């Protein structure tokens, strides 16, 4: 077994933080570094994956993360149309209220003017409700806007919450940050609540054998910085 210098440095940092460094915990930390493992648990399904990317790949295949859906984007109902006979106009913003859209357009424009941010005219500390009125068909036509055809757009919906996303990358980022909980390999080894994804389980079963752990110790023995820890492990074994 050949352990790179970079991994050895990380191992020494790890060992330096432990009050009583244990062989198995050290070996598990080594596996994390050497195999680029970043275990995460998908709590909802109680499954642990070896990396977030692996979790996304497998869960996507099972259609458990997202689904495509269509939404209809339509403009608001026109305020003025061919059936409008009278309009009430806000002189500060140009907002218009049509007699055939509002049951009581005069009350509607009064409500608007009382809170219109551009209406700075006040009398006795109260906003003045000044507005314009027209029944001229040519004036009304100027305010008429033909309705737009609704737009059909494909978006992505979270399979967990139903929340919509414009594109897939932000949905996946949200899934990883919200629904995948990071774990250390030592935590994975010590827990009993969750099952391991099959390829992750096979990887650990293959790595956690006496011959490979012994080869790990032999590789560390080539570096004197690890001798103090190896001595402790050997003494414990004896």
Curated annotation (Swiss-Prot):
InterPro entries: DUF2709. It holds the Pfam family DUF2709. It comes from the Bacteria. Belongs to the chlamydial CPn_0658/CT_538/TC_0825 family. This is Protein CPn_0658/CP_0089/CPj0658/CpB0684.
